[in-house]
C-alpha cells in the first residue's frame, strides 16, 4: 500500500509539472540523471520516468502548456485521499467496536494507537497535496514574465526542482518507514499486553479456566483473521482504483504527445510552403535587379570609352 501511494504521488507530480517547462531554452544543460537499475524501488523508477518526462515537456508549445495547466490532477488526488481516509476511518471504528470485550485499558491503548496511525497517514497525504499546489503556484507566477527572462530562470529552476523532488521523495520514504515501524511496534505491544493478561489464566492449572481461556481466545483469533482479510481486500480495491486512474492519465498524456507531434508536422509543412512562396516572390525581383545593374554598368563603361581623351587644338 505504501509503495503504491509513493508511485501514485510521484506520477501525479509528473502530471502537474507538465505545465511548467514548455518553453525552456538550451542555454544551460539539465542536471545529469541518476542511473536506474532493475533492483531500484518502484517509486525511484517512477521518479526517473518523471525526469524523462520533464525533458520531453521542454519541446511542448505554449498552447499545449495552457491545456495542461489546470487543477484536475490535484482534484483527482484529493478524491482518492478522501476515499482512502474514509476506508481507514470505517475500519478503525469497526475494530474499536470489536475490541469492546477487552479490558478498558487495553482497548483505550489500541484505539489511541490506531488513531495516531490514521492521523500520521492523513498528515503525510495532506503534505503531499500541499507540495503539488506549491509547485504549480510557483510555475504559474513565473509564466507571467518575458520569454527571455523565463528561459533564463527556468533553466536554474529545473535544477532546484529536481533537488526538491529528490529530497521530498527521500523524506516520504523515511516517513513511510517510521509509519510502518510505528504500526508494527503498536501491534506488537497490543499482542504482548493481551498475552500477558491471558498468561495468569493459563498458569492457574485449572482445566475449567484453561478451557474458558481457549474458548475466549479462539473467537478473537478468528475475528482478527477476518479483519485482516477484509482490510487486505479493501487495500487491494484502493490499489486497483489508483492503477486505473494512473492508466487513464497515461493514456491522456499519450494523446497529448500525439497532438503535439501532429501540430509540429503541420507547422513544418506551413513553414516550408511559406519559404517556397517567399522564394517565388523574391527570385524574379532579384533577377530583374541584377539585369538592370548589369545594363547600368555596361552603359557607364560605354560612356567612358566614348569620352575624348585630349583637349581640342587652338586656332591661330
UniProtKB/Swiss-Prot annotation:
Which regions does the record annotate with the repeat sequence? Answer: 79-100, 101-122, 123-144, 145-166, 167-188, 189-210, 211-232, 233-254
Principal location listed in the UniProt entry: secreted
Sites of the modification Methionine sulfoxide? 142
For region Homooligomerization, the annotated ranges are 265-316
- Give me the ranges of the annotated region Lipid-binding and lipoprotein association: 209-289
Residues carrying a glycan:
211
Q: Which residues carry this modification: Phosphoserine?
A: 146
Q: Which UniProt key words apply to this protein?
A: Chylomicron, Endosome, Extracellular matrix, Glycoprotein, HDL, Heparin-binding, Lipid transport, Lipid-binding, Oxidation, Phosphoprotein, Repeat, Secreted, Signal, Transport, VLDL
Which residue ranges are recorded for the region named 8 X 22 AA approximate tandem repeats?
79-254
The keyword Secreted appears for this protein:
yes
Give one Pfam family.
Apolipoprotein
Residue numbers spanned by region LDL and other lipoprotein receptors binding: 157-167
What's a GO cellular component annotated to this UniProt protein?
Answer: multivesicular body, internal vesicle
What is the protein's known function? APOE is an apolipoprotein, a protein associating with lipid particles, that mainly functions in lipoprotein-mediated lipid transport between organs via the plasma and interstitial fluids. APOE is a core component of plasma lipoproteins and is involved in their production, conversion and clearance. Apolipoproteins are amphipathic molecules that interact both with lipids of the lipoprotein particle core and the aqueous environment of the plasma.
Q: What is this protein called?
A: Apolipoprotein E
| Organism of derivation | Capra hircus aegagrus (Wild goat)
Q: What is the lineage of its organism?
A: Eukaryota, Metazoa, Chordata, Craniata, Vertebrata
